[in-house]
Amino acid sequence: IPTNWKDDVLLENYAYGHMSQGKAPGGWVMKMSPDGKNREIITMGFRNPCDFALNRDGELFVYDADMEYDIGSPWYRPTRINHGISGGDSGWRATSKKWREYFPDTVGSVVDVGPGSPTGVIAGMNARFPTHYRDALFICDWTFATMYSIHLKPNGSSYIGEKREFISNSDGSLALTDVVIGPDGNMYFCVGGRGGQSYLYRITYTGSESTELSQLDTTSEHAKARATRRKLESFHGSANGEALGVAWTHLGSEDYHIRYAARIAIEWQNPKFWAQKAYSEKNDLA
């Protein structure tokens, strides 16, 4: 995460409800070494994420909450899946200060899910399920008693997603709290809370569809775009003499997430080396 951000807003803040004085950066995801000594915030700007997962490409996805007090307001943000890219700010702020989807410095959602209470998240890669489920994420909604499968499709160096109902209970008595894939390839999930009965369930696939993993994409234009973005992300977190030369040409990329990674790489460099270059830049995207 760059060090030059602040909890600032140009427009008047309409404060109401609980968390009305919540401060940036909101929720965040941290990477740390096994001994806990080296810690680094990777991505931020969430409301209340309980869980996240990594897909087969090693990309991070965060299931973030909505704010119930905002429902019906122009700045309401539904629960959603966010791509947790390095240096990313997903723009959640208290009350009306939320960053709009069209802001150039926010990371948009991969797929909006809707009102709910996000809990557990797991990638399906180790499940003994049909192939299309092994490439999916599984997310739990406590409030509406539903587990969704999220099917990701590459979109440049990022993804877009499709949500599909995987399991649900129409009477609401399936308050999902967490989900795992066991070493046997079956899915296990638990429910409970707020005075409700707790249960542990197992889901086993017994059909005839193939359960083989699909071939991992390493050669497509999307895979190459992800590699470019990751190269730029390698400059995040510290000054590097090569960063400006590599990143500057990508500031005008048609790929939003590559532009984003390039900008963060440059923000980690001393402005005295690039401020004048920024003033003279002619590319509107850059």
How should these model regions be labeled?
Residues 1-235, 265:
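Beta-propeller domains with acidic blade repeats across secreted/periplasmic ectodomains
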Residues 225-239, 249, 257-269, 276-280, ...:
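Structural detector for internal amphipathic alpha-helices that build alpha-solenoid repeat scaffolds
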Residues 106, 132-133, 246-248, 256-258:
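Glycine- and acidic
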Residues 104-108, 274-275, 285-286:
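Short amphipathic alpha-helical patches
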Residues 49, 244-248, 274-278:
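Buried hydrophobic core positions in alpha-solenoid tandem helical repeats
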Residues 25, 243-244:
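N-terminal alpha-helical segment
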